[in-house]
Design a protein with these regions (language model features):
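Interdomain/boundary linker segments immediately adjacent to catalytic/signaling cores
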Residues: 10-79
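Short, well-structured alpha-helical interface segments that form or flank functional binding sites
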Residues: 62-70, 98, 125, 129-132
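A broadly used, surface-exposed interaction patch
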Residues: 72, 76-98
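Secondary-structure boundary elements
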Residues: 77-82, 107-110, 140-144
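Active-site beta-strand-loop-beta-strand hairpin of nuclease catalytic cores
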Residues: 96-113
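Catalytic cores of nucleic-acid endonucleases
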Residues: 116-175
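Charged, structured surface patches that assemble and position nucleic-acid processing machinery
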Residues: 161-207
Length: 207
């Protein structure tokens, strides 16, 4: 993994703050990530060793929650119609379910329900439960399509596509979602920003 010297990181951050096309990411994504507060690891092993460590898992979970908020903002700021701006909860079979993303695409007019996942490496039972939830929520919403959205992958690899397509579900990456709406940044700018600005922030928090 490439390590950038501290002064290099500072230069990149200053450059991005003054680069007009990055204003949107600075104003929307960065504050969400900066608001993450790591928790201490709750581990019997660490306790026995009398070691205090921050939970990297808590940081990743918080990142997943905030990146979901960010992409809802992106959808709202585009010409697509964000259907969950006022309410992202729905009753499904007696249970309250959270809606990650639900919008009508300006590109193809399709009503999409997307389940946001930063990781697709589930065990088989969790995959079944998650797939079932997507189909149930899609039906309750009356959406045309239910699918997974991975906000940290440019394009989904063929292995994951095949695995989920065989179960009747699609999986989309960032490039696909950006193609559905007019956005204020490109896919290259997004991933460069994650690497050069967001990564150092999360490292400083203990990731």
């Amino acid at each position: 993994m490439l390590r950038i010297p501290a002064m290099g990181i500072l230069f990149v951050i200053i450059l991005l703050y003054t680069f007009p096309t990055m204003d949107y990411l600075n104003e929307t994504l960065l504050p969400l990530i900066e608001s993450i507060t790591p928790r201490q690891s709750e581990s019997y092993t660490l306790s026995a060793l009398n070691l205090n460590r921050q939970s990297s898992q808590s940081i990743l979970i918080s990142f997943g929650e905030r990146i979901e908020q960010f992409w809802n903002k992106v959808i709202s700021d585009s010409n697509s119609l964000n259907l969950i701006e006022d309410n992202n909860l729905i009753e499904v079979n007696g249970k309250t379910r959270q809606i990650d993303h639900n919008f009508v695409s300006e590109e193809d007019g399709v009503n999409y329900y997307l389940e946001s996942k930063c990781n697709l490496n589930f065990d088989s039972e969790k995959i079944k439960a998650s797939n079932k939830k997507i189909n149930e929520v899609r039906e309750a919403l009356g959406a045309d399509e239910g699918a997974y959205f991975v906000p940290v992958v440019r394009e989904i690899n063929q292995k994951d596509l095949t695995k989920y397509n065989n179960k009747g579900l699609k999986v989309y990456g960032v490039e696909w979602l950006l193609n559905q709406s007019n956005t204020k940044f490109t896919v290259d700018e997004y991933f460069t920003y994650l690497e050069t600005v967001i990564a150092p922030v999360l490292e400083n928090k203990g990731l």
